[in-house]
Amino acid sequence: ELIGLIPASMREDLLDGIDVKGELQLAAKVEGTYNENSMPAVNAEIKYNKGMISMPEMLPYSVTNFNTHINADIDLNDKSDVYVNYLKANMSNSSFSLSGNIKDVMDKMYCNLKLDATADLDELQSFIPEDIVAKGVLKLNATANVNNYQITNMDFTDAKINGNMQWDNMNVVYCDTINVVADKLNVDLSIPNSTSEDLTNSLAAVNISGTNLDAKVADMIVAGLKDYSITAQVSDVLDENIPMSVYADYSFSRIDASMDDMNFFANNPHGSVAMFMEENNDAT
């Protein structure tokens, strides 16, 4: 009904190829003085329920079950804050949920956010680079405490990011040459690395685990891992001024590999490995 109030000429420009439905509730309080030197402060509450958005030219499926509740304190004379109580949506078999807040949204952008998402990659191939074919179901849970400076400068030394990714029925093909298959792949990421004992300049802790993983490079190399776990401490790879370094503990119940006429296997290998880059980029 609200869209019907928009002049037809404007609807054609703004909503061409877009179909939007749902129930919108808006409440706002405006307080202050409007003049050349001042703008009134606005306290707003936005609720959008039973939403549906269809954009065939951009999205392969309609966005459904779009529900959100947002509070905003907008003060252009000082700082503005946005509070996302919840923002949820589905797209076919994929889903998305976001909550948290963004302080000083017009400038510093101090973000404290929580994300939960499920992506059915079979349905989202149009968003994936053409030289990659990816299948399976990707589940992501993450929390982030970052700001605009850190994001813009890719400097996460003072950021706090924790996340878990679970990839079920993983099947990835790159350039029709490299194929990686796993029944379930788990990746845990933590920034900063709170357990950095073996790497003094460690930025992140990464844990990769799963039950079965098979990889193939053309018809030359075939390899497989069973019951694998890799726990790595990684330096700030985004800082070009810091030589890259990695320290990792690993354990597998079995490794199998073959190349041409050579075959290799090992039962229960485990240990630690370290790589340190010197200033001249030589690895040791």
Q: Whereabouts are the PLM-identified features?
A:
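Short, recurring structural edge motifs at helix starts
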Residues: 13-14, 129
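Hydrophobic lipid-interacting interfaces of membrane-associated proteins
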Residues: 1-4, 19-35, 44-107, 116-126, ...
